[in-house]
Amino acid sequence: MFSVDGDNVIITGGSRGIGLALAEGFSSAGANVITLDINPPEVEGNYNYINCDLGNQDHIQVVLDRIFSDGFIPKVLINCAAVTIPAPSHQYPDTDWRKSISVNLDAVFTLCREVGRIMINSSISGSIINFTSIGVEQGFANNPGYAATKGAVKQLTKALAVEWGEHGIRVNNIVPGYTNTPMNSKSWNNPLLRKQRSDRTVFGRWAEPEEMVGPAIFLASDASSYVTGVDLVVDGGWLVKGM
């Protein structure tokens, strides 16, 4: 039921952090994994890496066309890649805003559209998993590009889940809390910020990237055959904790 053995899987942002953990986890579970990222993986594994500039929609299209023409038809797409560029909103540069939209939203839609199309045309009942953030459930200051794009992805997921359900395609979000990844290294390396974020959870600690693998395999596999359009929160109790 929880098997992804033999499934073709595309993962963006698979060079480090959560994306790398997903690439290693799915390949260890027997999936055929292709990772897309602008940089090669920090750790070599039993998966294929393809250079892809996720801020360039034309390049994404070229890469996907090559993957599909080689006969790799995905059953699972995981959009994990993202950029975070913090700055006060009243001083936020247009270049950072556009980069956030390009990588965090445009790339997600392009990948969903192209993979969704080939799933539909190939009659594949597949699974698309988009990573959002606890920042779409609460207000986080000084990062408008990240907040806006992740919020948009949340709603895109729900729209696609409704539209593509008739084709047997499930589309869901994973909502991670603070995770020990290179993206969060500034907060992780600051003892005060690390403790503040740890204390906000029920477990008193951050997540490790590997803790996102199980939820992703659940959503990718037949174990979630009747689950679509949901936000699967993996935050150590951040959102539910009160006083």
Predicted ranges, named:
Residues C80-I85, G237:
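Conserved NAD(P)H cofactor-binding loop of Rossmann-fold oxidoreductase domains
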Residues P88-S89, P93-I101, R197:
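Substrate-binding pocket helix/loop in short-chain dehydrogenase/reductase
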Residues H90, Q138-P144, E166, G204, ...:
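Active-site loop immediately N-terminal to the catalytic Tyr-X3-Lys motif
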Residues C112, T149, T157:
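Active-site helix of classical SDR
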Residues R117, V162-E166, S225:
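Alpha-helical segment proximal to the catalytic Tyr-Lys
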Residues S133:
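Residue(s) in the substrate-gating loop at a strand-loop-helix junction
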Residues Q138, I217, T228-M243:
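Short C-terminal tail/terminal secondary-structure segment
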